[in-house]
Amino acid sequence: MSRYTDISYEGTSYTVNTGLDIKDFQIEEDWYNRPASEWSVKRIGQLQGKVEQYTYRIYHSNKYGKHNLARLIPGHVLISFANECFGYDGWSSEVEEITSLEHTENAASEDKRESHTVLAEARVKLVLKDDTYTFAGGFGKSTMPFKGEAFAKAKKEAITDALKNCLLGFEKVILDHEIKIKQNYYVDGVFKAEMSKIEGKTSIPRTVR
């Protein structure tokens, strides 16, 4: 049973192909892009409420036209919202990958000094305390007088962008979750597509989601 849910796997049968031993496989819960508990459903809803209130104010300022308003929320504001909704110790993030995609050296001119432009990409994993988690990518671009400074700033912006995408992406997680509930997609806490409970049918068990 999950630490934060009432889902039980008692009575669930697992089978494997002939010649394989099920004991050789490790079955574990995986809550990627799926709320692991009512706690995360509620707290993600609170986060979305704060995002909507913030973008509502931007919209009525008539300054940005038809832009994706959520993208205009500063990273530090979203992080503050996350701390308020999930708690300071209720979520964490980890940089899975960061790459410099492009580096351009800009030659000096009469009115400009030499500079460096760097484009970076990052992939961040965000985990809530009930094991709900998601991944997202982000980009950062910076032009600075020195190459090292340009690389550092571009990577920092890429990480911030990826983290923002994680937090903003929770809206889709909840919407997909609600649709699956209405469609009776979940069976005893596992996805229908990954587990078979038909007697006599064999399959290699994958990660339980």
UniProtKB/Swiss-Prot annotation:
InterPro entries: Rad52_fam, Rad52_Rad59_Rad22, Rad52_Rad59_Rad22_sf, Rad59
Pfam families xrefs: Rad52_Rad22
This protein's GO CC annotations: nucleus
One GO BP: double-strand break repair via single-strand annealing
Magnesium in keyword set: no
Chief location: nucleus
Cell compartment(s), UniProt: Nucleus
UniProt keywords, alphabetically: DNA damage, DNA recombination, DNA repair, Nucleus
Top-level taxon in the UniProt lineage: Eukaryota
DNA damage keyword on record: yes
Subunit structure: Interacts with RAD51 and RAD52.
Family: Belongs to the RAD52 family.
General function of this protein: Involved in the repair of double-strand breaks in DNA during vegetative growth via recombination and single-strand annealing. Anneals complementary single-stranded DNA.
Stated name of the protein: DNA repair protein RAD59
Lineage: Eukaryota, Fungi, Dikarya, Ascomycota, Saccharomycotina
